[in-house]
Amino acid sequence: MTLRSAEPLESAGGPRERWGRPGAAVAAAPVAEEPREAARLAAAMEELRRAGWYWGSMSVAEAKERLQDAPEGTFLVRDSSHSEYLLTISVKTSAGPTNLRIEYQDGKFRLDSITCVRSRLKQFNSVVHLIEYYVLMCKDRTETPSNGTVHLYLNKPLYTTAPSLQHRCRITINKCTNQIWELPLPTRLKEYLKEYRYQV
């Protein structure tokens, strides 16, 4: 991922209202779709909370302070300060902390971008899946920034609190296999692993 500037991508407006509020992008769905849409969003948000690096309501300034001394590639997800968006990724780049909005439309999440590029960006049913995709994509850092370009890497999440040993083990297992039900483990433990199938 590449940014031409290290300037924040969203303004430091007041705290956003909760997702699903009247007038937000998700409210454009037909009336018959609203319960299903709400259920999808609720499931996505619950999964995001389970990840441990969703900070909820946090201003641009607070995110910058949290990331200021972190290594490049450290990131967190928070509620967007912009009323048209649900969430924002705040990440430490080589030029300092910056922000990238997450767009939600027609039941899919994708990174916000300029119109001519937006249609080419991958879309995901899950915020965590979106983050995982870009974390894995950023593992091979072969490009060298040039011409004032700032490359944006997602490497390491900034947790709200230290994750439990169980959760860390779950992530490690996910990095090794996706065949959870083939593992010689008790069913209850397999169910726990199934609750979070990501590598980040």
Where are the regions that the model predicts?
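Eukaryotic low-complexity, non-globular regulatory regions
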Residues: 1-43, 139, 156, 160, ...
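Eukaryotic proteins' extreme N-terminal regulatory segments
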Residues: 35-65
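Short aromatic-glycine-(Arg/Gly/Cys) micro-motifs in beta-strand/loop hairpins
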Residues: 39-45, 96-98, 102-115
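Eukaryotic beta-rich interaction modules
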Residues: 54-61, 66-73, 80-84
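Short, structured protein-protein interaction patches enriched in aromatics and acidic/basic residues
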Residues: 73-97
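Cullin-RING E3 adaptor/co-adaptor recruitment helices
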Residues: 101-106, 113-200
